[in-house]
Amino acid sequence: MGMEGLLQNSTNFVLTGLITHPAFPGLLFAIVFSIFVVAITANLVMILLIHMDSRLHTPMYFLLSQLSIMDTIYICITVPKMLQDLLSKDKTISFLGCAVQIFLYLTLIGGEFFLLGLMAYDRYVAVCNPLRYPLLMNRRVCLFMVVGSWVGGSLDGFMLTPVTMSFPFCRSREINHFFCEIPAVLKLSCTDTSLYETLMYACCVLMLLIPLSVISVSYTHILLTVHRMNSAEGRRKAFATCSSHIMVVSVFYGAAFYTNVLPHSYHTPEKDKVVSAFYTILTPMLNPLIYSLRNKDVAAALRKVLGRCGSSQSIRVATVIRKG
């Protein structure tokens, strides 16, 4: 379908929300808004800490800062509109707004898939080839990894968004979701989308399996290397280096596995919305918290910054007292 078809489709959609008719919309708004603020704050703090503390100017933390940037944009794609809909009776989203939401969502989730895979490779090099780490993970390689993650993630967006929005939507304009997720949008189409859904399923599984293969191979080599270590301290450091990444991967890929791998018989609109809420709202909050709570370097950098702020405040108070 060409431009004429797109123009015929260019009318507003209606989002039903996370809960279609919430009994306490104010309470739901407060919960989601609190999570949103914590997620944005935690990710921005992580980015600033990595930028400010010279001890964190390493490839691992550079990649972690990029993950925080992705998480910050990721949660801003869906949550502000969701919060607006909780307070407003007008829950519409424009055709263009829906298309933009789909494109950014696919780009960010795909980008995170690839970035988490490349972060596993970084851990593999650090544990298995520590002497060659500066060479194998130099600045050019890190930049290539980040650009590759964004480009790889955007492939899904560029391929799937135009096709999805080209279908004729002649049924209800009501999307049973809190944002424009492709399966929910396709249910409004009055044409057979089964072939496209099969191809989309294969595309998403491929996007999932490529980085998952990198993660699996990397951690297999890490486990073999750790097993051969004689030093208990060396083993502890190796596991400490990888534990935060493993937790983040488990959370993110667990939700993605449900969405992209399980057959349609397991899916219901209610389940889909809960899982989507988990990895679009909760995951961006959990990622920086997991890394900050389980990582001594990040915790030390945070204490250092807080200590500076406390010292500066004490000096200001003392100066004011002297002047008084």
Curated annotation (Swiss-Prot):
Cellular compartment(s): Cell membrane
Record has Disulfide bond as a keyword: yes
Transmembrane segments: 27-50, 59-80, 102-121, 141-159, 197-220, 238-260, 274-293
Protein name as annotated: Olfactory receptor 2T2
GO biological process: detection of chemical stimulus involved in sensory perception of smell
Record CDD domains: 7tmA_OR2T-like
Primary localisation category: membrane
Disulfide bonds: C98-C190
PANTHER family xref list: OLFACTORY RECEPTOR (PTHR26453)
InterPro entries cross-referenced by the UniProt entry: GPCR_Rhodpsn, GPCR_Rhodpsn_7TM, Olfact_rcpt
Top-level taxon of the source organism: Eukaryota
SUPFAM superfamilies: Family A G protein-coupled receptor-like
Lineage: Eukaryota, Metazoa, Chordata, Craniata, Vertebrata
Cytoplasmic membrane side: 51-58, 122-140, 221-237, 294-324
Topology, Extracellular side: 1-26, 81-101, 160-196, 261-273
Cited PROSITE patterns: G_PROTEIN_RECEP_F1_1, G_PROTEIN_RECEP_F1_2
